[in-house]
Curated annotation (Swiss-Prot):
One of its GO terms (molecular function) is phosphoribosylformylglycinamidine synthase activity. This is Phosphoribosylformylglycinamidine synthase subunit PurL. Keywords: ATP-binding, Cytoplasm, Ligase, Magnesium, Metal-binding, Nucleotide-binding, Purine biosynthesis. Substrate binds at residues 92-95, 114, 238, 310-312, 528. It is an enzyme of class 6 (ligase). ATP binds at residues 50, 89, 488, 525. Its EC number is 6.3.5.3. It catalyses: N(2)-formyl-N(1)-(5-phospho-beta-D-ribosyl)glycinamide + L-glutamine + ATP + H2O = 2-formamido-N(1)-(5-O-phospho-beta-D-ribosyl)acetamidine + L-glutamate + ADP + phosphate + H(+). The active site is at residues 47, 93. It comes from Cereibacter sphaeroides (strain ATCC 17023 / DSM 158 / JCM 6121 / CCUG 31486 / LMG 2827 / NBRC 12203 / NCIMB 8253 / ATH 2.4.1.) (Rhodobacter sphaeroides). Pfam families: AIRS, AIRS_C, FGAR-AT_linker. It is found in: Cytoplasm. GO terms for cellular component: cytoplasm.
C-alpha cells in the first residue's frame, strides 16, 4: 500500500507545528515515514506530552509519608495502613464526549478503570464531574442524556459503584462539554505493578481485545480545538465493551497473582504507540514490535492504523519468558487475545516491522523525554472589579432560584442511572457530599469527592484553585474522613493565549498552596487543554478528586438531622456574595472577586469537626448557595422543615469559605460550644430543623412545595 507524501498540509493535519516538524528532521536526520509521522504526532501532542503544562505541574507538592507512588505512573498510590493501598486517578474524555456522547463517556470510564487495575488494584469506586452547556442550547439535552447513559452503561456492566461527582451547566460549555472520570481501587501495598520495562530480550505481549480502526488519531483530536468540521471527527471516538473490560480485569489480576509480569501498561491515548514507548522509556530500553502478530478485527490494517488505534480493553505487558504458558492459559480461559508482538532491545530504538518492511525506526527516548516543552507566555488574571450593590431578595425566592436551577437541583435523574451499590460495600451513596465505601473485610472505609467552582477560578485563578482543594477537604471532613491525597484534572482553553495560560498558572499556584497546607498531595492527574470551539473557551475548570480515610466506620458522620435539632455553623460568616450562585442564578451576574480561602482556618476548622464528630448528628460543607442552600439540602434529605434566623441576603447566601453546617441534638450543643471556645473556633447557632415548613429570616414556604421544585427541576430542564 502506497503511503501518502509528507506535505505541509499532512503535517498540520497531524497537529504538528512547522518548528516541531523541523525538530523531527533534526532528530532522525531524514524525512519521517507516514507511520513515523503519526507516532511523533501522537507522542508530541498536548494530550500525551503535557508540553504546555509540564513546567508548572512540576511545582505541585506530590510527596508525603502516605504517598507510595506519585504522578508519572498510570495512577497514584497511597498507603491506607494494614499493608493496603488505594490507587486512584481522574482523567478527562471531553472532546470524544462532545462528538459522540455515549461512547465518549463510556470509554472515559473504561480508560480510567484500566489505569487503576493495570497497577494491580481491584476498582472499588467511580465518580464523574460533568460540565454541560445551558439546558436550552440545542445540543445540551442530547449530550447530557448520552453522557449519563454512557457512564451508567459502562460502569454498571463492569460492576463498579459510582459514588459521587458533580454536574454543572454554563453557557461556556455550550460547544465543549467536560467529562472527567475518576476511579479508585484497592491493592496490597507490596503488590503494585509498574510500567517500566526491564531486561533485554523479554517478550512484549499484547493482551485483551482485538485492534480495529476506532479511535485512530484520538489523542491528536483531543489536543485540538473544535470548529465546524466537528462531525468529521466522529470516527476518532473509540467504542467500548464493558463485559470485555470486566474479563480483562479478572484476567489481569489472575496474571499478576501468578508472578508472570515484569511490567504492564494499559493502551489508552495513542494506543500501542504510547504504551510501548512509555514502557521502554521508563526502563531505558528499546522496543521492537512485529505488527503481523497484533490481533486485528478488521482486514488490511496498515502499520499507521495499528500503531494509532485507540481500540478499547487492551493492555501491553513485558512478560517473564518462563511464564508464557501460564499467562497464555489465563487469557485463553477468559476468552481474550494473548499475543507476543515484540521484545525489549538494548538499543534506544522504537522499531516497527510490518510484513517484510520497517515501518518505523526511531530513537525511543526522543518520542518522550525530548518531546517539545513550552514555557508559554502568560499574563496574570487582572483583579476582579469590586462587586456592585446586590439588592436584598426575598429569601424564599432566592432559594427557589437555586433549587430550580439544574446546576443546584436534586440530581437523582443522573445518579439513579448509575449503580451505586454493586459490590455491596457502599456506605454512603451519591446525593449529599462525599461518597463512602467500606474497605472489604476490614473496619476501614474510604471517602471520595470531586470539587471545583469554575466561576471562582475565572475571577481569581489563585483563590479558585485553593478553593477547589479546600472544598474537597471539607467534603471529606464532613463525613468524618481524614483527607489523604488528591488527583487533579486541569480543563482549560487554548494555552497559546496568554490570558488562558495565566488562568492555568494561577490555578496551579493556588492548588499547590492548598494541597501543601492541607497535607493532600497531588498523586496523579490529567491536563486537558484546547477546550474551545470557534475560539470560545470554557470556564477554567481544575477539577480536584480527593480521597479520605476512616480507620473505622465508628468515625463516620452519616446521620441526618432529627426533629428539633439545632443548626450551627462552624467558621466565620462575612457574607461574601462575589461570584456567588445566588448572584448568577437570580441576577445573571458573574461579578466580583472569588471568596478568599484562609487555609489555616480550613485546617483548624476541619480538625475541630473531626475531633468532635461524636457531638454532631450530620455535617455539610458550605459552598455554592451558602447557608440557605446547604441547610435546605440537609433538611430536605431528612424530610424535615427548617428555620434559619440570620437575616439578609449576604448572611443566607454568601459563600465564605472554611465553614460547615452541623446538626446537633439540643442536649449536645453546650458541649460543642465549649469545645469550640477551647479550640478558638467560631461556632454560631443559626436555626433549627423540624416541622413541615422552610422559614428563612421570617419568609416561609411549605417544604413539600420546595421539595417538588428541587426534585423535578433537573429532569424538566433537559426534557428527561
Amino acid at each position: 500500500m502506497t503511503e501518502p507524501e509528507i506535505t505541509p498540509e499532512l503535517i498540520a493535519a497531524h497537529g504538528l507545528k512547522p518548528d516541531e516538524y523541523q525538530r523531527i528532521l533534526e532528530i532522525i536526520g531524514r524525512a519521517p515515514t507516514f507511520t513515523e509521522l503519526g507516532i511523533f504526532s501522537a507522542m508530541w501532542n498536548e494530550h500525551c506530552s503535557y508540553k504546555s503544562s509540564k513546567k508548572w505541574l512540576r511545582t505541585l507538592p506530590t510527596t508525603g509519608p502516605q504517598v507510595i507512588c506519585g504522578p508519572g505512573e498510570n495512577a497514584g498510590v497511597v498507603d491506607i495502613g494494614d499493608g493496603q493501598a488505594v490507587i486512584f486517578k481522574m482523567e478527562s474524555h471531553n472532546h470524544p464526549s462532545y462528538i459522540e456522547p455515549y461512547q465518549g463517556a463510556a470509554t472515559g470510564v473504561g480508560g480510567i478503570l484500566r489505569d487503576v487495575f493495570t497497577m494491580g488494584a481491584r476498582p472499588i469506586a467511580a465518580m464523574n464531574a460533568l460540565s454541560f452547556g445551558v439546558p436550552d442550547h440545542p445540543k445540551t439535552a442530547h449530550i447530557v442524556k448520552g453522557v449519563v447513559e454512557g457512564i451508567g452503561g459502562y460502569g454498571n456492566a463492569f460492576g463498579v459503584p459510582t459514588v459521587g461527582g458533580e454536574v454543572r451547566f454554563h453557557r461556556a460549555y455550550n460547544g465543549n462539554c467536560l467529562v472527567n472520570a475518576f476511579a479508585a481501587g484497592l491493592a496490597d501495598a507490596d503488590r503494585i505493578f509498574y510500567s517500566a520495562a526491564s531486561g533485554v530480550g523479554m517478550p512484549v505481549v499484547y493482551l485483551g481485545a482485538k485492534t480495529g480502526r476506532d479511535g485512530v488519531g484520538g489523542a491528536t483530536m483531543a489536543s485540538a480545538e473544535f470548529d465546524d468540521t466537528i462531525e468529521e471527527k466522529r470516527p476518532t471516538v473509540q467504542v467500548g465493551d464493558p463485559f470485555t473490560e470486566k474479563r480483562l480485569l479478572e484476567a489481569c489480576l489472575e496474571l499478576m497473582a501468578s508472578d508472570s509480569v515484569i511490567s504492564i501498561q494499559d493502551m489508552g491515548a495513542a494506543g500501542l504507540t504510547c504504551s510501548a514507548v512509555e514502557m521502554g522509556d521508563k526502563g531505558d530500553l528499546g522496543i521492537r514490535l512485529q505488527l503481523d502478530a497484533v490481533p486485528q478485527r478488521e482486514a488490511n490494517m496498515t502499520a499507521y492504523e495499528m500503531m494509532l488505534s485507540e481500540s478499547q480493553e487492551r493492555m501491553l505487558m513485558v512478560l517473564k519468558p518462563e511464564k508464557e504458558a501460564v499467562a497464555r492459559a489465563i487469557f485463553e480461559k477468559w476468552d481474550l487475545d494473548f499475543a507476543i508482538v515484540g521484545e525489549t532491545i538494548p538499543e534506544d530504538r522504537f522499531l516497527i516491522l510490518h510484513g517484510n518492511e520497517v515501518k518505523a525506526d526511531l530513537p525511543l527516548k526522543a518520542l518522550s523525554g525530548t518531546a517539545p516543552e513550552y514555557d508559554r507566555p502568560w499574563i496574570e488574571t487582572p483583579a476582579a472589579a469590586p462587586l456592585g450593590a446586590v439588592p436584598e431578595v426575598d429569601p424564599i425566592e432566592g432559594l427557589k432560584a437555586l433549587i430550580g436551577s439544574p446546576s443546584y437541583a436534586h440530581k437523582a435523574w443522573v445518579w439513579e442511572q448509575y449503580d451505586s451499590q454493586v459490590m455491596a460495600d457502599t456506605v454512603r451513596a451519591p446525593g449529599l457530599g462525599a461518597g463512602v465505601v467500606r474497605v472489604h473485610g476490614t473496619p476501614k472505609a474510604l471517602a471520595f469527592t470531586s470539587d471545583v467552582t469554575p466561576r471562582y477560578v475565572k475571577a481569581n485563578p489563585f483563590e479558585g484553585g485553593k478553593q477547589a482543594v479546600a472544598e474537597a477537604y471539607r467534603n471529606l471532613t464532613a463525613v468524618g474522613a481524614k483527607p489523604l491525597a488528591t488527583t487533579d484534572n486541569m480543563n482549560f482553553g487554548n494555552p497559546e493565549k496568554p490570558e488562558i495560560m495565566g488562568q492555568f498558572v494561577g490555578a496551579i499556584k493556588g492548588i499547590g498552596a492548598a494541597v501543601a497546607a492541607l497535607d493532600m498531595p497531588i498523586v496523579s492527574g490529567n491536563v486537558s487543554l484546547y477546550n474551545e470551539t470557534d475560539g470560545v473557551g470554557i470556564l477554567p475548570t481544575p477539577t480536584i478528586g480527593a480521597v479520605g480515610l476512616l480507620t473505622s466506620l465508628d468515625e463516620l458522620i452519616a446521620g441526618q438531622p432529627e426533629e428539633g435539632d439545632l443548626a450551627l455553623v462552624i467558621g466565620t460568616t462575612a457574607g461574601h456574595l462575589g461570584q456567588s450562585a445566588l448572584l448568577a442564578e437570580m441576577f445573571g451576574r458573574e461579578e466580583g472577586d472569588a471568596p478568599p480561602v484562609d487555609l489555616e482556618a480550613e485546617k483548624r476548622h476541619g480538625e475541630f469537626l473531626r475531633a468532635n464528630r461524636k457531638l454532631v448528628r450530620a455535617a455539610a460543607d458550605l459552598s455554592d448557595g451558602g447557608l440557605a442552600l446547604a441547610a435546605f439540602e440537609m433538611a430536605e434529605a431528612a424530610g424535615l422543615g427548617l428555620t434559619l434566623t440570620p437575616s439578609g441576603t449576604a448572611a443566607l447566601f454568601g459563600e465564605d469559605q472554611a465553614r460547615y453546617l452541623v446538626a446537633c441534638a439540643p442536649d449536645r450543643a453546650e458541649a460543642l460550644q465549649a469545645a469550640a471556645e477551647a479550640a478558638g473556633v467560631p461556632l454560631q447557632e443559626v436555626g433549627r430543623f423540624g416541622g413541615a415548613t422552610v422559614t428563612l429570616a421570617g419568609a416561609s414556604a411549605p417544604l413539600a412545595d420546595l421539595s417538588r421544585l428541587y426534585r423535578r427541576a433537573f429532569a424538566e430542564a433537559i426534557g428527561g
